[in-house]
């Protein structure tokens, strides 16, 4: 009986240890760039983008990296990137003029596929449902969010409402979108191959928007530095939104909300992430990872409870589209890998 009890205790300890046994391995650091764009194509192919016109690429799982400065865009901030293979990627420069560039030769040459010099234009994030269909969102122009879509892998971009802004939601004063990790918007194909999606705002008000509806998110809001930063959805259409207050990044108040009905109702986690978080992703249907300037958290129960695994600062985290590898990136050119 005693031996059975000892075995049970041993197995319990082993389970508890393995439940949150993840760690972070820093692969790159020291490059003068703040990385907020990250796209992991496979376990081997990773692209990243950031300030000072910088793009990074690895084709061997992060063992070696090629660092590029995009010619004529040396002072631009590429806040998001979408890569399709080792040669093809799209990068997004945020401020006036808003610019989207594309490469087909691994970053050696880039060409312009979109430009908008409208006063106040500021692009925040991109999302792709597949290799052809994507959407970009930007801060409001005259109270209306800027949205553009592509159906040809970013070669051309179009206005989905064809100038009829009455079809777009009206944003409150001080409500906008954070360009913190390129993940406050998502589009995907449902089981019937129908295009679905949504995006989350922050600032004075924080809401989640679908094509026809919008819902207030029960998160901290009311200041320009508060609200939703990132939204993720799994194959069961379970959704999670993270954010907080980036000026008080250890404050965990109102930094996470979960929904299983596209934002109609939200619940708060039982144990929240440990501070402001700028990005969240699903590793699998129940396991998630979130990161921010005050650390990294893991959840093994769909986002209800979070465990701090590192106090290292990162802006963005992404999993391989085709594979299992998870990478993170942040300031000072830091790129890391999650060790499961």
Over which residues does each language-model region extend?
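Bacterial Sec-dependent N-terminal signal peptides
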Residues: 1-23
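Residue-level hotspots at or immediately adjacent to binding/recognition sites across diverse folds
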Residues: 22-340
């Amino acid at each position: 009986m005693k031996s059975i009890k000892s075995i049970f205790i041993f197995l319990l300890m082993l389970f508890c240890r393995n439940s949150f046994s993840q760690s972070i391995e820093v692969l790159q650091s020291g490059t003068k760039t703040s990385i907020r764009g990250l796209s992991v194509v496979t376990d081997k192919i990773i692209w990243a983008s950031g300030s000072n016109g910088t793009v990074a690429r690895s084709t061997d799982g992060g063992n070696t990296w090629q660092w590029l400065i995009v010619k004529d865009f040396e002072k631009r901030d590429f806040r998001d990137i979408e890569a399709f293979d080792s040669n093809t990627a799209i990068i997004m420069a945020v401020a006036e003029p808003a610019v989207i560039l594309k490469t087909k030769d691994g970053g050696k040459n880039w060409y312009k596929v979109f430009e908008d010099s409208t006063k106040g234009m500021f692009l925040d994030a991109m999302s792709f449902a597949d290799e052809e269909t994507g959407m970009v969102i930007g801060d409001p122009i005259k109270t209306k969010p800027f949205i553009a879509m592509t159906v040809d892998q970013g070669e051309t971009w179009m206005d989905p409402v064809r100038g009829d802004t009455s079809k777009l939601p009206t944003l409150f004063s001080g409500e906008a979108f954070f360009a913190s990790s390129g993940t406050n918007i998502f589009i995907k194909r449902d089981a019937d191959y129908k295009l679905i999606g949504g995006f989350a705002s922050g600032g004075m008000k924080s809401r989640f928007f679908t094509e026809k509806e919008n819902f207030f998110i029960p998160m901290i809001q009311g200041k320009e530095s508060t609200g939703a930063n990132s939204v993720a959805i799994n194959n069961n259409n379970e959704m999670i939104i993270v954010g907080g207050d980036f000026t008080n990044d250890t404050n965990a108040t109102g930094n996470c909300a979960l929904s299983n009905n596209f934002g109609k109702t939200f619940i708060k986690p039982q144990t929240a992430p440990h501070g402001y978080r700028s990005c969240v992703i699903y590793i699998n249907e129940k396991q998630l990872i979130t990161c921010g300037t005050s650390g990294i958290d893991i959840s093994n129960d769909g986002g209800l409870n979070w465990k701090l695994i590192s106090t290292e600062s990162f802006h963005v985290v992404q999993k391989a589209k085709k594979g299992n590898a998870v990478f993170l990136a942040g300031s000072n050119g830091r790129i890391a890998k999650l060790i499961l």
